[in-house]
């Protein structure tokens, strides 16, 4: 099942709804939904997750991106993009809190991550405006980072298994592509079955992950054991 956040101007979103008492059904995104994300793979959100944290009073929020390029020499977080994880704790499908994540220019191994939040957005909804406040966490990519507020952050490559022979899949069921242009491709099937033995085509690839763990109390609007939050992620220019 697919759950979507609103489509933002030059922004891409994916999300879930979770009970903080016990994480409910997790719903994940598609990949390369639009020409914009296929032409700009660092804008492509793979999945958004909410997991129980390292203790009963904590929650982990995860957004993965860019899986087609991780493992190549162009793999890095885009310094020109704003990565956001948004939280609705009022049940109206509008964000009440945001995490805003940005990166500096450079190769992945030299990048630094800056995380602001959880904080009320400057303008909720379809606008994407940087919140003017100090970073909650800041430090090198690929490092476990902490803070005195209980927020922990990791940003960097992580294995994200997806067991499929994707090349043969599209030989069987060709993707919907235009007949001309940069994204053109075949429109007729050239195979009727998967290869035997199977090919784990995506095995060499990782995803770029942004992981934030923090006390649940920092996201909730009440102390009710039935309190729920909605979680989604966006990437925008």
Annotate each PLM feature:
Residues 26-237:
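Surface-exposed extracytoplasmic segments
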